[in-house]
């Protein structure tokens, strides 16, 4: 590879990464304009919020739903690998960020907040803080980068472990969250309420 080719490649990758950063910034600004709180209304920021049905859930840097966002990264890397096979990694990341940021905006809209409150055990859910939502997107990116480097079998094993572990500890995980959002099952809701 010539010096000119190397310079072009660096410039090209830089473009994609700047575009990725722009998507995250657009997510944050949009959530601010939607009236989301920047940080927990409690006035402080915690590295980890271990309560599930607490006012601090979805308000701090990480929580029991962080593994779900890491799994999003695994899945979105796989999608990018399939549909953008010849594109650079940063282009695949941009696709992942569009999907994750789009979900974060939808998740924090009145439509989905109300759906969570009526169809799931999240009766006190009022949406994510901007900080938590941005960190959900960052954790998705971490999952994406992990999946881009790790063997597929290891990535799948970690995803299964996350699902089983969070399902056991808090009776919720990515799979149950999707099921309860799209097609609520009363028996699952009752089981989840036993936490």
UniProtKB/Swiss-Prot annotation:
The keyword Amino-acid biosynthesis does not apply. It is a multi-pass membrane protein. GO terms for cellular component: plasma membrane. The chain crosses the membrane at residues 15-35, 64-84, 127-147, 150-170. It is found in: Cell membrane. Belongs to the UPF0314 family. This is UPF0314 protein Rleg2_3744. It comes from Rhizobium leguminosarum bv. trifolii (strain WSM2304).
């Amino acid at each position: 590879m010539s010096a000119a080719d190397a310079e072009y490649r660096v410039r090209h990758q830089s473009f994609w990464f700047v575009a990725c950063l722009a998507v995250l910034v657009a997510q944050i600004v949009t959530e601010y304009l939607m009236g989301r709180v920047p940080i927990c209304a409690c006035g402080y920021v915690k590295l980890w919020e271990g309560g599930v049905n607490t006012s601090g859930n979805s308000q701090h840097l990480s929580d029991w739903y962080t593994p779900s966002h890491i799994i999003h990264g695994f899945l979105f890397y796989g999608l990018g690998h399939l549909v953008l096979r010849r594109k650079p990694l940063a282009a695949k990341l941009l696709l992942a960020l569009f999907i994750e940021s789009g979900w974060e905006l939808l998740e924090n809209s009145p439509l989905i907040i109300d759906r969570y409150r009526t169809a799931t055990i999240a009766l006190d859910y009022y949406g994510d803080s901007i900080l938590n939502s941005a960190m959900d997107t960052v954790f998705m990116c971490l999952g994406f980068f992990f999946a881009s480097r790790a063997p597929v079998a290891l990535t799948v094993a970690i995803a299964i472990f996350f699902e089983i572990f969070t399902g056991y500890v808090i009776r919720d995980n990515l799979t149950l969250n999707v099921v309860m959002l799209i097609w609520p099952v009363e028996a699952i809701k009752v089981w989840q309420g036993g936490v």
